[in-house]
Structures are given as structure tokens and as C-alpha cells.
Design a protein with these regions (language model features):
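Residue-level signature of outer-membrane beta-barrel architecture
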Residues: 26, 62-66, 112-113, 125, ...
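Outer membrane beta-barrel
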Residues: 55-186, 276-279, 290-296, 300
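Solvent-exposed loop/turn segments connecting transmembrane beta-strands
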Residues: 47-52, 128, 160, 204-206, ...
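Outer-envelope beta-barrel architecture signal
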Residues: 27-37, 66-72, 117-121, 166, ...
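Transmembrane beta-strand segments of Gram-negative outer membrane beta-barrel proteins
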Residues: 26-48, 72-74, 143-144, 150, ...
């Protein structure tokens, strides 16, 4: 009897321990499955030292975990500017938040399948610059070309800020290697109805845009190689054409604070607006200061443009930063000097 009682006590203890483990696991899962929300507000004063304008961008986001393997993401943007005219007649657009007034636009609405720790797949509405051209060094700079090389964005009406498109995206990520590939509707949009609505997918009318990229990481340095193929109507002519392009850029860490940046993009079609883009720069981090210098060259519409950006991002808190920027842009025979003061709040 004593041995039977002992066995019963042991079984009861194991059951209680198992229940406790399951309850703890359930609590952990409930925490991990809680939705998360984000807010990013960017305010920018721009001046060409003759007149000034004010641009504001509000981005809202939410992520809902449907299970441990499936999630749903939503994001939107709203933009307001005091003047829709450009301060400079530059070809690349010196500010990556420069846009017309947009009361509300849906930028992300995707279902993601987290296949395992390395593989994921999503389908839905998204911008390509959410996944491409968004590395740490490039993201410091405000020039639009650092968020999407003009060998793509100046040639094809694809889904880059502020427009989005329906697409599918696959990603593979491990410690030193990341591979991604995407297929999008060929024309980006932000409206909810009509010919240019964001829910539209029409390869015959809008074309298709396929792209992929490989990233190699080594000792905090990053090396990227990518290619894309656009099949649809080009910006400047109402006819179907194929527009292949390649790009490469590297972020070489020299010291814990200093990184060198080199970028190149090439489009192969002889009739393209922009065939080549190249840039060199550096970033340096000291305490809460991020310094950056980037200079690039491109040729668009048979016009040469050199653009140089000098910037310093001051991280005041984990949520607030201030970033003064100076742009010196030489477009053909015209030189513009643009000053920018950017405020960013991220919650």
C-alpha cells in the first residue's frame, strides 16, 4: 500500500507539473500572440534659402499574430505639405518623404506565413522599399535614390513610396546569408477605387514586376546583389516593353563606428530614362550622433546630375530624433543648395 501511495503521489506531482508547464507555455504563447502597434511621424522643414516649405508624414502600423506561424500586417500613410511645388528642379528628388497631399493611403496589408525560423512567405499589398534598399547605412540618408535606385524608379511605375501594389514575397534568412524574391503588379497605386486602385492586379494593363536580392553578411559588413525585370508600360511611352536591371551595393565596416558605402545600378534597355546610377559615401556613429556623407551620379532624360548629401542624425531619446541635412545638387548647368531639418517620432 505504501508503495502504491508513493506511486500515486509521484503521478499526481507529474500531472501537476505538466499542467503547470502547459499553463506557462500558454501564457508565453498568449504574450507572443498579442497584437503590436506602431506610429512614425516625420516632419520636415525644407528651404532653398529663397523660400521654405513644410512636409509632414504620418505612418501607422499594426501586426496581428493569428497563430505562431501566421500573422497579418497593416500599415497606412497620410501626408500633408504646405506647397506641392518642388524647391529644386532635381531629377532624383532630394527628400524621400516629398509627396503631394494624401489624406490616407493603405501601404501594407499582407498575410505572412512564417514557415520556420529561416523561411517566410507573404501575400498582399506592400511597397518594394519595405524590403529592398532599406539597409542601415542607406536608411540614414534622405535622398530618394537611397530608398530605390533610379535605374528602377525613374524607368518603371512600380510600387515605391508613396504607392503600393499587390504582390507575393519570399524570404530566406540565416546568420550570414539572406535571399529574397518578389513578384508584384507592375503599377503602384494608392487609391481605393478607379483605374489606379491599390487592390488591382492586371498584368495585361499594369504589367508585372519581378525582383530578387542576395545579401551576404560578414563581421558587421553587408554586401547586396540584386536584379529585376519589369514587363509593362514605361513611364514615358504607352507601349509594352521589358526593362531588366541589376544593382549592387556594399556597406563595409572599417571600425565599430565607421562604415563605407558604395552603390551601383544599371538598366539594360537602350531606350530607358535612366541607365546608370553610382554612389559613394560613409557613415560614422559617435554616441547618439549618426553622421553621413553620400555623393551620387546619374543621368536621366539625357541630363547629368550630381547630388551630395551631408547629414547628422541626433538621437535625443529612443523615440525622438532630429536630423539636419544639407543637399548640394548639380543638375545639368544648374546648382541648388537645399537645407532640411527633419524631426522623427517613432513609437
Amino acid at each position: 500500500m505504501a508503495s502504491a501511495s508513493k506511486r500515486a503521489i509521484i503521478v499526481l506531482a507529474l500531472l501537476l507539473g505538466g499542467c503547470h508547464h502547459l499553463m506557462a507555455q500558454g501564457d508565453a504563447d498568449s504574450v507572443s500572440l498579442r497584437p503590436s502597434f506602431g506610429l512614425d511621424y516625420t516632419s520636415e522643414l525644407q528651404t532653398n534659402f529663397s523660400w521654405t516649405k513644410w512636409v509632414n508624414l504620418l505612418e501607422l502600423s499594426a501586426e496581428v499574430h493569428l497563430s505562431r506561424k501566421f500573422s497579418f500586417n497593416l500599415a497606412s500613410l497620410s501626408a500633408v505639405t504646405t506647397n506641392e511645388d518642388y524647391l529644386a528642379r532635381d531629377l532624383q528628388v532630394f527628400s524621400n518623404i516629398e509627396v503631394w497631399n494624401i489624406p490616407f493611403a493603405l501601404t501594407v496589408a499582407v498575410f505572412t506565413w512564417h514557415i520556420n525560423d529561416r523561411h517566410s512567405l507573404f501575400a498582399g499589398i506592400r511597397r518594394i522599399d519595405e524590403d529592398y534598399f532599406c539597409s542601415d547605412a542607406l536608411s540614414l540618408f534622405t535622398n530618394s535614390s537611397c530608398g530605390g535606385f533610379p535605374t528602377i524608379t525613374a524607368n518603371c511605375p512600380v510600387a515605391t513610396y508613396p504607392v503600393s501594389a499587390l504582390g507575393i514575397h519570399y524570404a530566406y534568412d540565416r546568420e550570414n546569408l539572406a535571399i529574397q524574391a518578389s513578384l508584384y503588379n507592375g503599377t503602384g497605386a494608392y487609391e481605393f477605387t478607379g483605374r489606379y486602385n491599390v487592390f488591382r492586379i492586371s498584368p495585361q494593363n499594369d504589367g508585372l514586376f519581378a525582383l530578387g536580392q542576395v545579401e551576404y553578411r560578414h563581421h558587421d559588413s553587408h554586401y547586396f546583389l540584386g536584379a529585376s525585370l519589369y514587363d509593362g508600360d514605361l513611364w514615358w511611352e504607352d507601349k509594352h516593353d521589358m526593362c531588366p536591371s541589376v544593382w549592387a551595393y556594399a556597406e563595409q565596416k572599417l571600425t565599430p563606428g565607421l562604415t563605407l558605402l558604395a552603390a551601383y545600378g544599371h538598366a539594360f534597355d537602350s531606350d530607358e530614362f535612366c541607365k546608370n546610377f553610382c554612389g559613394l559615401g560613409a557613415t560614422y556613429t559617435y554616441k547618439k550622433l549618426d553622421f553621413g556623407l553620400f555623393s551620387d551620379y546619374t543621368r536621366i532624360l539625357e541630363v547629368d546630375e550630381w547630388a551630395t548629401e551631408l547629414t547628422c542624425n541626433v538621437n535625443l531619446t529612443n523615440y525622438l530624433s532630429v536630423q539636419p541635412v544639407l543637399h548640394i545638387i548639380k543638375t545639368d548647368d544648374e546648382t541648388n543648395c537645399i537645407g532640411v531639418l527633419r524631426l522623427n517620432v517613432s513609437l
